[in-house]
Amino acid sequence: MGVSSMFRGENACSFTALGLFSPAVVIALFLSGCTSESTTPELSDSDLPEQATWDEVIRKAQGKTVHIGMWDGDPMINAYIRDWVAPPLLKEHGITLQQIGSQGAATVSRLMVDLESGRSTGDFDLVWINGENFFQLRKMQALYGPFTDRLPNSRYIDWKNPFIAMDFQQRVDGYECPWGNVQQAIICNSEHVPDPPRTLDQLAAWIHQHPGRFTFDNGFTGMTFLKSLLYEFAGGRDSLNGPFDEARYLAASAKLWAWLREIQPHLWRQGETFPENVAQLHQLFSNDEVDFTMSNNDGEVDNKVLQGVLPEHAKAFVLESGSIRNSHYLGIPVNAANKAAAMVVVNFLISPEAQLQKAMPAVWGDGTVLSTELLPEEWKNKLEHIDGRTRVPPRSELERSALMEPAPEIMIRLNEDFRREIIERAR
């Protein structure tokens, strides 16, 4: 499949300062029933008739500029977009891809301001969406769609896979397209920990025997780790699926806080403080201050070793009780100026070629959203055997212990309750 086929397929309330809030607070505001009182802006001339063919989409995309709002904090991800994605888009369709640094609450805030003001053409044509942001944007009616069924390369995606079709327990329904799929992994110093703990009991025992050598961050990655543990205390796999259940959460979290309080004195700095984010945790690990770090991307360990962020002896694994697996997505704002061009970009990004390139640890190490069972044999073999993935088990093995993202309310509660039950009690 050449570059052309990658694009075409084989057949041709007012929160204008929202960015000041954390994602958890933003979700809480929406869950409390507070949404923008403004109406969705009138659709612009850039909107496509539902019956438009893919060839018509391609023609409308010619020569346009697509502004993609995405996190720009990783030089290797930026290089993938700049050096590998942008050139063929420009050559094939004259599409100029411009990256705008924006993520999370900042993106939601900018889109909300647009909606409140009735601005028909916004700053973004495409946005990188993670979990809770999709929940917020759907509540705001800020996303264009459904559009994924119009993408030729979407035929390689298994839309029955709940890790694709559901985003934080909410159906995507064609309003965002999966771009990458990852699973949280714990990373250990294989020289100090040649046989890492595989169960919660074994982990607790290891922490007691090696005081000060384990911790987790106080940010998104650490809270995702706690979500994975919460499943075990709630009854195991599938126990937290479905809408938020207050009683179930309280029962499971009480066991989680008891487990954490029991190991807390044996954590790094006696559990009185925690790294603010996973970057700080990686630094502690690299400085040999702790023997474990972690990542929400199972493929990141190889990528970060190549970057020199993590040492050569870093190895990744998953507890037998499982870990959170999720997808990150691309969405088109309802007021995007160039929706057709954005669709062409998304179709390219989910092509087998682009997904394989992105999965390479030397490029990004981001897992594919394509189902190998739906791919031609050539691509099936390539995506099942990623060059350079040597420090983490195969994705097919990790999938057996994958846990779905629970309802977004759980992330809010864990953020709040962890501070009250663990951090403040230690002071």
Language model segments and positions:
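N-terminal secretory signal peptides that target proteins for export/translocation
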Residues: 1-15
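C-terminal motif of bacterial Sec signal peptides marking the signal peptidase cleavage site
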Residues: 32-33
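Extracytoplasmic/periplasmic substrate-binding proteins
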Residues: 268-335, 380-381
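Extracellular/periplasmic catalytic domains that process cell-envelope and extracellular macromolecules
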Residues: 60, 119-122, 136, 168-171, ...
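Extracytoplasmic ligand-binding site segments that recognize negatively charged/polar headgroups
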Residues: 71-84, 98-108, 124-280
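Conserved C-terminal helix/tail region of periplasmic/extracytoplasmic solute-binding proteins
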Residues: 50-52, 283, 390-427
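Early extracytoplasmic/lumenal segment of secretory-pathway proteins
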Residues: 37, 46-132
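Mature extracytoplasmic/periplasmic domains
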Residues: 323-324, 328-398
